[in-house]
Swiss-Prot record:
<dbReference type="GO" id="GO:0007018">
    <property type="term" value="P:microtubule-based movement"/>
</dbReference>
<feature type="coiled-coil region">
    <location>
        <begin position="638"/>
        <end position="673"/>
    </location>
</feature>
<keyword id="KW-0963">Cytoplasm</keyword>
<keyword id="KW-0547">Nucleotide-binding</keyword>
<dbReference type="GO" id="GO:0005737">
    <property type="term" value="C:cytoplasm"/>
</dbReference>
<dbReference type="GO" id="GO:0008017">
    <property type="term" value="F:microtubule binding"/>
</dbReference>
<dbReference type="InterPro" id="IPR027640">
    <property type="entry name" value="Kinesin-like_fam"/>
</dbReference>
<comment type="subunit">
    <text>Interacts with aurka and plk1.</text>
</comment>
<dbReference type="Pfam" id="PF00225">
    <property type="entry name" value="Kinesin"/>
</dbReference>
<feature type="region of interest" description="Disordered">
    <location>
        <begin position="39"/>
        <end position="129"/>
    </location>
</feature>
<keyword id="KW-0131">Cell cycle</keyword>
<dbReference type="InterPro" id="IPR036961">
    <property type="entry name" value="Kinesin_motor_dom_sf"/>
</dbReference>
<dbReference type="GO" id="GO:0005524">
    <property type="term" value="F:ATP binding"/>
</dbReference>
<feature type="region of interest" description="Globular">
    <location>
        <begin position="1"/>
        <end position="192"/>
    </location>
</feature>
<dbReference type="InterPro" id="IPR019821">
    <property type="entry name" value="Kinesin_motor_CS"/>
</dbReference>
<keyword id="KW-0206">Cytoskeleton</keyword>
<keyword id="KW-0505">Motor protein</keyword>
Length: 682
């Protein structure tokens, strides 16, 4: 039934009952009249004085017909639109039929059907003007939808131009591009202030290299602001749908792939130079995966296997040291500059400036660590430093890996030492660490690879704990846990000690796991959370000295300080060091100690004692036998005593060799007991 008549909109409102529910609808009068011709009022055409001229000639008619045909496609689209409206419940799907019939008559060429006022066109205008509000809203939504689809199509075409659609990771590449487009970039610039840190941890990202570009690897690292690093880790759901897991880390500084060595040095190592002039100890580490840019950062640019040492942090630090020596307040101190360069490989120390001579690391009665036999070269200028760096780099232990054709396999330590009248005034240690992914090679079938990986793993764990102890002023620093931290003991002990770590990362998706491990390691050193409210782990609240004394009193490890520190180190890193891995580290440490003792006794017995034996026979016993009336009883007694002494020495050496062989077998057995699901590499 009709409930109301709306004169303004020329429509009526009707209601009816359907299945017990009252329903309503608004219908315009034109639709009603088009369906019920008997109800339509008679239209009178008033021929006024403004009547248009008579019909034009045939050529004119043809032109009008042509113009009408160009509008036809628009009319053909109208029913489709009205059908969609009818599906929603509108009753405006049919008023177009009279117009279409009128248009068809005009297309047939009947001139008499074309009235002066063109009523068909007038009806079409009224129909479009009298659409209901519901239809208008639907048409607006349709226009927005079509406009949005057009924009999406243009965006897809633009992306197709920017990216290579043949890349197998094209989908991930588009996700990363979309995510980066939503970020606000504020990268680090040279105008930013330099903050003072006792412990500075920063990250440097290198660009994609030629190998990664050739295999179409993706850049999954983003550095939006000066202290934040984001990793876009590709993952896959159970239904094989790929997605990104974006992980955020915060450090003191973050350098993108465009930052040169000079910029990195300005914010990291340069603030430490003044420390050594103030009787302090400064340390700068380069840490990361093989091929991530550690040696490039510390030593300089590479051109194949040739390195430009003048652009590395080694040379830049030496340049500033000599510049500060010219300042009046330091010039009067009459300081002398010395340099040393050595490497630590598989727990052994080698002098890179003295034909890789093997050195011994000892601790004197004052608990001062001494590297016996290490050469210190006096340097007068930066050119002298560059020559020493070239000599050391040329003989550093390296090898070919899947990541790098010239990969460093040892920790290289370059030290700039200031001395005043022979006494140490300050020391700056610059360390290029070995690749952290080698720490996972602790279960290799090759013993040398196992020892190499075990030493790297242990030294990196010890380094992390020593830096944490320095930053938190802990009463005990486990520097004896590894040879690296033992040599650098002075850098972790004392109030005037400062440390900087440069974590270098590879941007490629293939290196994503190692990159995350590097960032997690660097994050644990200082623990700067993006939310700036992270609390220290629970185990840090306990006093390490108490635990160390407890183990010592229990007698589990005897009195060896290095074993106590190793135990402490593994206890503080339970999530990274399994019990089997700890047993393996213990076996390796014992084996290395036995090896040093055997080699030392071997050198003492055969070259030295044999010469004394021959000299003693020549001067004493053999000369005695040349006499006519020599005392044969005395000769036999002395010879027997010398032989017994010699036998005792050789027996002791033989026992040590047996113990060394047992240690080798124990290391072999321990390496096989490591859980295959071992902790990730540092």
């Amino acid at each position: 039934m009709v409930t109301s008549l709306n004169e303004d909109s020329e429509s009526i409102t009707v209601e009816w009952i359907e299945n017990g529910d009252t329903k309503g609808k608004e219908i315009d009068l034109e639709s009603i009249f088009s369906l019920n011709h008997d109800l339509a009022p008679d239209e009178e055409i008033d021929p006024g004085p403004e009547m248009p001229p008579p019909p034009a000639p045939t050529t004119k008619v043809n032109k009008i017909v042509k113009n009408r045909r160009t509008v036809a496609p628009v009319k053909n689209e109208t029913p489709a639109k009205d059908n969609r409206v009818a599906a929603v419940g509108s009753a405006r799907a049919r008023p177009i039929q009279p117009i279409e019939q009128s248009a068809s008559r005009q297309q047939n060429g009947s001139v008499s059907d074309i009235s002066p006022d063109q009523p068909g066109k007038k009806d079409f205008g009224l129909a479009s003007r009298r659409k209901s509000n519901c239809v208008k809203e639907v048409e607006k939504l349709q226009e927005k939808r079509e406009r949005r689809r057009l924009q999406q199509q243009e965006l897809r075409e633009k992306k197709a131009q920017d990216f290579d659609a043949t890349n197998p990771n094209y989908e991930i590449m588009c996700m990363i591009k979309d995510f980066r487009g939503s970020l606000d970039y504020r990268p680090l610039t040279t105008s930013d202030p330099i903050d003072e840190h006792r412990i500075c941890v920063c990250v440097r990202k290198r660009p994609l290299n030629k190998k990664e570009t050739t295999i179409k690897d993706l850049d999954v690292i983003t550095i939006p602001i000066k202290d934040v690093v984001m990793v876009h880790e590709p993952k896959q759901k159970v239904d094989l749908t790929r997605f990104l897991e974006n992980q955020t880390f915060r450090f003191d500084y973050a350098f993108d792939e465009t930052a040169p060595n000079e910029t990195v040095y300005r914010f990291t190592a340069r603030p430490l130079v003044e420390t050594i002039f103030e009787r302090g100890m400064a340390t700068c580490f380069a840490y990361g995966q093989t091929g991530s840019g550690k040696t490039h950062t510390m030593g300089g640019d590479f051109s194949g296997k040739n390195q430009d040492c003048s652009k590395g942090i080694y040379a830049l630090a030496a340049r500033d040291v000599f510049q500060m020596l010219k300042k009046p307040n330091y010039k009067k101190l009459e300081l002398q500059v010395y340099a040393t360069f050595f490497e630590i490989y598989s727990g052994k120390v080698f002098d890179l400036l003295n034909r890789k001579t093997k050195l011994r690391v000892l601790e004197d009665g004052k608990q001062q660590v001494q590297v016996v036999g290490l050469q210190e070269r006096e340097v007068k200028c930066v050119e002298d430093v560059l020559k020493l760096i070239e000599i050391g780099n040329s003989c550093r232990t390296s090898g070919q890996t899947s990541a790098n054709a010239h990969s460093s396999r040892s920790h290289a330590v370059f030290q700039i030492i200031l001395r005043k009248k022979g006494k140490m005034h300050g020391k700056f240690s610059l360390i290029d660490l070995a690749g952290n992914e080698r720490g996972a090679d602790t279960s290799s079938a090759d013993r040398q690879t196992r020892l190499e990986g075990a030493e790297i793993n242990k030294s990196l764990l010890a380094l992390k704990e020593c830096i944490r102890a320095l930053g938190r002023n802990k009463p005990h620093t486990p520097f004896r846990a590894s040879k690296l931290t033992q040599v650098l003991r002075d850098s972790f002990i004392g109030e005037n000690s400062r440390t900087c770590m440069i974590a270098t990362i590879s941007p490629g998706m293939a290196s994503c796991e190692n990159t995350l491990n590097t960032l997690r390691y660097a994050n644990r050193v200082k623990e700067l959370d993006p939310s700036r409210c992270r609390r220290p782990p629970p185990h840090d609240t306990s006093c390490p000295q108490t635990s160390w004394m407890t183990w010592k009193q229990c007698g589990e490890w005897g009195v060896a300080p290095q074993r106590d520190d190793l135990k402490l180190l593994c206890e503080q890193n339970e999530e990274e060091v399994s019990p089997q891995l700890f047993t393996f580290h213990e076996a390796v440490s014992q084996m290395v100690e036995m090896e040093e003792q055997v080699v030392e006794d071997h050198r003492a017995v055969f070259p030295g004692t044999s010469i004394r034996w021959l000299e003693g026979l020549k001067k004493c016993l053999l000369e005695m036998t040349e006499e006519v009336d020599y005392d044969a009883d005395s000769y036999a007694t002395q010879l027997e005593a010398i032989l017994e002494k010699k036998i005792d020495i050789l027996t002791e050496l033989r026992d040590k060799v047996k113990s060394f062989r047992a240690a080798l077998q124990e290391e072999e057995h321990a390496s096989k007991q490591i859980n295959p699901k071992r902790p990730r590499a540092l």
